[in-house]
Amino acid sequence: MAKKSAENGIYSVSGDEKKGPLIVSGPDGAPAKGDGPAGLGAPGGRLAVPPRETWTRQMDFIMSCVGFAVGLGNVWRFPYLCYKNGGGVFLIPYVLIALVGGIPIFFLEISLGQFMKAGSINVWNICPLFKGLGYASMVIVFYCNTYYIMVLAWGFYYLVKSFTTTLPWATCGHTWNTPDCVEIFRHEDCANASLANLTCDQLADRRSPVIEFWENKVLRLSTGLEVPGALNWEVTLCLLACWVLVYFCVWKGVKSTGKIVYFTATFPYVVLVVLLVRGVLLPGALDGIIYYLKPDWSKLGSPQVWIDAGTQIFFSYAIGLGALTALGSYNRFNNNCYKDAIILALINSGTSFFAGFVVFSILGFMATEQGVHISKVAESGPGLAFIAYPRAVTLMPVAPLWAALFFFMLLLLGLDSQFVGVEGFITGLLDLLPASYYFRFQREISVALCCALCFVIDLSMVTDGGMYVFQLFDYYSASGTTLLWQAFWECVVVAWVYGADRFMDDIACMIGYRPCPWMKWCWSFFTPLVCMGIFIFNIVYYEPLVYNNTYVYPWWGEAMGWAFALSSMLCVPLHLLGCLLRAKGTMAERWQHLTQPIWGLHHLEYRAQDADVRGLTTLTPVSESSKVVVVESVM
């Protein structure tokens, strides 16, 4: 099971590792405290290392990354930002920031996970002093897992309600409608109708059944955050169904997840193509597409355009969440992650651009039918998914079919992003657990506990005041500010503390050649500058959260939001400070010791080829029958 290298005196691991964990030990044999099994543990620690599973096929990894990174933001946020920020002009800052910031960090996270064979926390064994980055990403992805699934619950609810002959949001007269509800959608209907002395413009200010279904039936919206109200049991059951679905997608690990994403990641593209074909055949579709792409060069000098481009890149590429490192950790050590990262980035951005044609062809039709400017119907986020599009399908023949198709696509887009996010969190969590917690059903129980905890927190979002809670999570916990902060430190640590050239050599060891020098330059200079620049702009131009342009959050609600943001951002400095204070020696000695990488077992053969094998002295077989290995570390 272990063989000795004649040249270096170092053993490498081989044989059947599935029969038991691998034991990693320090020279004193003392049990490790706090660090997990992905690397060689804390200096002088003893840890059991469960064998790490890998993707059955490399395409499983590609599909999982596509499913995770290509999500709701590509469909409901990018097209609106493109229209809002000068149409085709928006593509200039978007592409530039993708080249300088998005793609380099996307590649960095995947390659780091593949090289270290660890989840979001233990991947920073490459520089243990900055392991706070791992804790920060775990906090962020936990918040995302908690609130993101609410969109799936709402989409699932709309999907169920679409299986009717008449869509419930198409007409008034329901128990949730008010006397102000008006069913007239088409401008020509408005001109020919008896309006009780109301003009068409005045009628447009009345309540549509689409808005009343969303606010009064689905959300049962209260007056504010301070009025939580009761649970909406229909939406609660949809939420429970979504969590059960997520659990069974994740509970067996990447072997099962890698199969499910073949459907969840590809079928939305089929639906997008069908919706595009339908959309371009509608009257007014061309006008909508022109509004989507029409360049407004004056916007290029606006700082907000660059801020929106940067935050959208980091959102849509799913940077800073730790899930990409978790997915990369299941790759074969020699997988060409460089090629994969480029392909995945192109798919992500291409999907965003393509989705814009789908969305704005339908919004153009909607504006034409209502006789209004497209700015009156163009919306982003939940407003597009649950107000604008449901309103548009009521104007189409066979409306329930198009509604069901759209919400099924929405459900799949969100589902794979959700369960891969949960997978990333679980991977980081299991890597943290010490040897004594390793048992057969460890993953199944951990996933169940995670899903149950998130479901309990989600109950606050299915109350009458739940939308206000959802907006708090969305605006603060995984905001552009937190992701930019995370990305900045990732680049600084890898490029300046560990060493950009050193990491390029590590990548060359995996894929057989050094990537383009552009990646090294970006990690070292361009990307940190871009991240910090947009981060500062976000702080300077910060505006307190307002819901629906009317409800201003109370001071304690805003304080709660900043607590969400700071709970991840402070992980880096607090962990760094704590490590330096606990260590012994001069400050220089502490820094040198705490920035020394902790290598994993899979690095043995690779590191043994170097003249300077840092941190490893011997690898001794302990028990041939139990397939246990002891590695001594001088770190």
Swiss-Prot record:
Residues 1-60, 109-138, 252-269, 326-341, 416-444, 501-520, 582-635 are cytoplasmic. Glycans are attached at residues 192, 197, 548. The chain crosses the membrane at residues 61-81, 88-108, 139-159, 231-251, 270-290, 305-325, 342-362, 395-415, 445-465, 480-500, 521-541, 561-581. SUPFAM superfamilies: SNF-like (SSF161070). Keywords: Cell membrane, Glycoprotein, Ion transport, Membrane, Phosphoprotein, Sodium, Sodium transport, Symport, Transmembrane, Transmembrane helix, Transport. The modification Phosphoserine is found at residue 623. Pfam families: SNF (PF00209). Its main location: membrane. Residues 82-87, 160-230, 291-304, 363-394, 466-479, 542-560 are extracellular. This is Sodium- and chloride-dependent creatine transporter 1. It comes from Mus musculus (Mouse). The lineage of its organism: Eukaryota, Metazoa, Chordata, Craniata, Vertebrata. The gene is Slc6a8.
